Amino acid sequence: MPVNLKGRSLDSLLNFTTEEVQHLIDLSIDLKKAKYQGLHINNRPLVGKNIAILFQKDSTRTRCAFEVAASDLGAGVTYIGPSGSNMGKKESIEDTAKVLGRFYDGIEFRGFAQSDVDALVKYSGVPVWNGLTDDEHPTQIIADFMTMKEKFGNLKNKKIVFIGDYKNNVGVSTMIGAAFNGMHVVMCGPDNYKNEIDKNVLAKCIELFKRNGGSLRFSTDKILAAQDADVIYTDVWVSLGEPFELFDKRIGELKNFQVDMNMIKAAKNDVIFLHCLPAFHDDHTSFSKEVATTLGAKYPIVAKGEMEVTDEVFQSLHNKAFDQAENRMHSIKAIILSTIGY
């Protein structure tokens, strides 16, 4: 059955069907092939369209992906950064949404509260794309599962391990994506983290697993979790916007859940490693140096600036994080085109 997403918002993946999610993944792959063949140069279906990308949280990949994707499609882009809008401060989100909806054909929002995305959807009158909230990261997940499909083809019954802070937006979104693709997902980290996953989201995922196949389980043993895994995925232990003081607590909780070569060796020979980036895998950033200096003696695991993944894994051929990063652009192009183009 043909999929028509024109006029739809990507506020949450859970508002989409399995067929619609699969369509976005497949279209992303097709658009990537077209880009590599140079076919986008004379095919700009969104000439005359304009989009706004509204950021409460800065991001290299999300901003660049939206700007390049829109440019390839022929659309104009306005970037509104954290200091460029009074939304929620001097002007209500409702009023901001109504104004932006008069100017633009679509709005990307990257920030904190899912309720802000919901308000933009409700009041703007145009498609809204969730570039990240505290609850979910749907544009990232389309790119992630695109990357997996490029590697493995059919994802049904493939095994993915999300290790570390699996209760965060990327961990929860990975669980949702696995449910749409009939995969077996293991959420590996502290046992009490599972109690922090929204019960409604969990219930919807379980229903999707029943319908699409695959399974969900939780583990506190990273080697057992990694056995026969096709994909190992992790994210930072402290997210952008959270205080530096939180590193001590999180490292204490997650020190046994670092992705290392022991995990890789426990998985399948062709296992791929994914990370939405940026990653703390060495001491080449001011943050990782500060963590190593401040907490390296207390937690030797971070003494070299490595946190959620070792540099050995990150520099290995298993690492597909940069393919994944590139695919942000192709998948976002698919999302924009599907919702304001066709």
UniProtKB/Swiss-Prot annotation:
Amino acids binding L-ornithine: 169, 235, 239-240
Subcellular location: Cytoplasm
Catalyses which reaction(s): carbamoyl phosphate + L-ornithine = L-citrulline + phosphate + H(+)
Keywords per UniProt: Arginine metabolism, Cytoplasm, Transferase
EC number(s) on file: 2.1.3.3
Pathway of action: Amino-acid degradation; L-arginine degradation via ADI pathway; carbamoyl phosphate from L-arginine: step 2/2
Organism superkingdom: Bacteria
Chain ranges passing through the membrane: none
Physiological role: nvolved in the catabolism of arginine. Catalyzes the phosphorolysis of citrulline, the reverse reaction of the biosynthetic one, yielding ornithine and carbamoyl phosphate which serve to generate ATP from ADP.
PANTHER family per record: ORNITHINE CARBAMOYLTRANSFERASE, CATABOLIC, ORNITHINE CARBAMOYLTRANSFERASE, MITOCHONDRIAL
Assembly description: Dodecamer (tetramer of trimers).
Name under which the protein is recorded: Ornithine carbamoyltransferase, catabolic
